[in-house]
Amino acid sequence: MDGLLTPRESAKFIAENSRDVFIDDGGVRRVAELLLAKATGPELRIEGWKAIHELNPRGTDEAAVNWVFVTDTLNFSFWSESDEYKCQVGFGGKTYSGYWSLCAAVNRALDEGIPITSASYYATVTLDEVRHILRSDTDVPMPLIEERHRILNETGKILLEKFGGSFLNCVQKSDKSAQKLLHLVVENFPSYRDVTQFEGKRISFYKRAQILVADTWSVLEGKGDGCFKDISSITMFADYRLPQVLVYLGALKYSNELLEKLLKGEMLFYGNRQEVEIRGCSVWCVELIRDCLLELIEKKGEKTTGEINSILLDYYLWDYARDHREDMKGIPFHHTRCIYY
């Protein structure tokens, strides 16, 4: 990892050298003020991960941890070319799209007796079986099916070889350190290596690896093997929804040139300068929002129910984006098709 900036260092460096994406200090403060009203409620608590999302596992056992591992291994590229035509999966009487279509497909497979969360199964699962497991209820398939198949096989084999087929063994090797778990994941599983170049420096976002650590912390409710002492070192997860909501809320701004590109729906390739700026500035923006929010909480003498970190802010803003999808229609999100987010 020599000379490689951490996600937080990367974000700060990108924000300081950005040409097309800018953080608005007034907007940062306004978002922090919006979040202040939620600081004492259930929305910014670890319990919300299970309470608000019915597809997430209820348990805190090995099976729940392995569910998290397989969903985050496949947690990338759910955006559709059109809002009208998208991949949708029905489960439990409800229809889901985006990331939740994956969770619904995993739960549907488990209900059908397919052991999709077992490494010994997905290490050798065939492409046709993956197509069946991730099948859409519409004519639009889940994107990147071949990549998902390849990654499942690769990841399953590594989990069997190095960690006895269970992600819980990997978690237990981390000595209750979020950073140690993050490094175990990116060192052992190639598809989690979300690393590129910017201004001559090697930078990392580790979107899926960080969300895997965060979801492990959440599914274990921050207790036992999931009691990570350094959980606040994890940043927001740089994807395509969070930048959109930060622009909508006025905390992030795009240059006219970039905005035009995004409005036209032009693809930005992974590692492209503007794509890196969007992701990096979003991460740094959430770090600044968190700092501002903690300052406001201290000034008001509010009592929060637990430590407020970037993970909980990310969870809240991501849900906010989903709940305000109609209002945000005029704000474009960037189109990048890759396995990292």
From Swiss-Prot:
Residues binding queuine, per UniProt: 53, 237, 239, 314-315, 319
Superkingdom of this protein's organism: Eukaryota
Which residues form each disulfide bond in the chain?
Answer: none
One function term, GO molecular function aspect: hydrolase activity
Which InterPro entries does this UniProt record tie to the protein?
Q_salvage (IPR019438)
Q: Where is the active site?
A: 239
Q: Which residues carry this modification: N-acetylmethionine?
A: 1
Q: Which reaction does it catalyse?
A: queuosine 5'-phosphate + H2O = queuine + D-ribose 5-phosphate
Q: What is its EC number?
A: 3.2.2.-
Its keywords, alphabetically, are: Acetylation, Hydrolase
Instruction: Give the EC class as a word.
Output: hydrolase
Q: Which GO terms describe its biological process?
A: nucleoside salvage; tRNA-guanine transglycosylation
> What functional role does this protein have?
Catalyzes the hydrolysis of queuosine 5'-phosphate, releasing the nucleobase queuine (q). Is required for salvage of queuine from exogenous queuosine (Q) that is imported and then converted to queuosine 5'-phosphate intracellularly.
* Family of this protein: Belongs to the QNG1 protein family.
Q: What else is known?
A: Eukaryotes lack the canonical genes for de novo biosynthesis of queuosine (Q), present in most bacteria. Therefore, this molecule must be sourced from ingested food and/or the gut microbiota, and metabolized to its corresponding nucleobase, queuine (q), before incorporation into cytoplasmic and mitochondrial tRNAs. Incorporation of q into the anticodon of some tRNAs contributes to translational efficiency and accuracy.
Name used for this protein in its record: Queuosine 5'-phosphate N-glycosylase/hydrolase
